[in-house]
Amino acid sequence: MGAGASAEEKHSRELEKKLKEDAEKDARTVKLLLLGAGESGKSTIVKQMKIIHQDGYSLEECLEFIAIIYGNTLQSILAIVRAMTTLNIQYGDSARQDDARKLMHMADTIEEGTMPKEMSDIIQRLWKDSGIQACFDRASEYQLNDSAGYYLSDLERLVTPGYVPTEQDVLRSRVKTTGIIETQFSFKDLNFRMFDVGGQRSERKKWIHCFEGVTCIIFIAALSAYDMVLVEDDEVNRMHESLHLFNSICNHRYFATTSIVLFLNKKDVFSEKIKKAHLSICFPDYNGPNTYEDAGNYIKVQFLELNMRRDVKEIYSHMTCATDTQNVKFVFDAVTDIIIKENLKDCGLF
């Protein structure tokens, strides 16, 4: 009888120990949700987590990006060529018209993700054309990848035999996120589970079941989107869409107790763009100076003022450049400290 009882006690103690360990593990598990409109930079943040908190990209993984990079480069020059017609811009050299026609034809016939020499030569000639450059300067009037200039101006390096993509090449590459991508890593004694969710409208209905037990939401908005329209709807300004989405998330009853951090991303693109395009394009009431600081701060205030519970709930915001590893490392470190502080506060230890 006694032996049976002590075995039961032992089993009970083991179970208690296991439950305690599980509870501690749960307390140290951080569920992070990356939300934001399409092309705001969510997937680039995920790539940075791999670089900063995992072991980065192996040679094999880098090589897998070549096809994506070539595909992005081709799509970018094709978008510019098509816009030449729509915007009625003349080529600086009329011979480029033939190059453009040849390129359109080749794009339909080559194997996807490859870059034959004849094609890269044509692309390089087109990119140097003054008409193409004038069209590139008007990129906000049509849909063009942010990485267009980065790849097109460096195409010679990208097509060198034996080319291996650099971390920056990988970070700049773009594949539309469909569905939900989970990344796991450890940092500051916490186990992170980060979920990247497709941002375009058709993808958003998949978010809802991710909402259970979220520790922190990182909402990403592209600062540079103030003069752009949606891929899905060319009547809707991207910044307005982003504000609308942020409003519905930060005031959602699901997230009443969830920490929310706002990344105002693409500050590098924004700092160049604001020199040329006035913020009043997006916010007609804005009559402040058209500088990076003033315009950037005005955008930040537009987001933060949407928080209906700002008397009790603080939303932390950061200006970010998702392709800059040091910047992301610094900001994510600050976010982690916020998460630790908020979690300790919840446990009554802070």
Swiss-Prot record:
Domain of life of the source: Eukaryota
Biased composition (Basic and acidic residues): 7-21
Location of Phosphotyrosine modifications: Y142
Segments for region (G5 motif): 320-325
Entry keywords, A to Z: Cell projection, GTP-binding, Lipoprotein, Magnesium, Membrane, Metal-binding, Myristate, Nucleotide-binding, Phosphoprotein, Sensory transduction, Transducer, Vision
Lipid-binding residues (covalent, N-myristoyl glycine): G2
InterPro entries to which the protein is assigned, alphabetical: Gprotein_alpha_I, Gprotein_alpha_su, GproteinA_insert, P-loop_NTPase
Binding annotation for GTP: 36-43, 146, 171-177, 199, 265-268, 322
Chain segments carrying region Disordered: 1-21
Membrane topology recorded in Swiss-Prot or TrEMBL: Peripheral membrane protein
Domain G-alpha: 28-350
GO biological process, alphabetically ordered: adenylate cyclase-modulating G protein-coupled receptor signaling pathway; detection of light stimulus involved in visual perception; negative regulation of cyclic-nucleotide phosphodiesterase activity; phototransduction; phototransduction, visible light; response to light stimulus
Name this polypeptide is given: Guanine nucleotide-binding protein G(t) subunit alpha-1
Organism: Bos taurus
Lineage: Eukaryota, Metazoa, Chordata, Craniata, Vertebrata
Gene: GNAT1
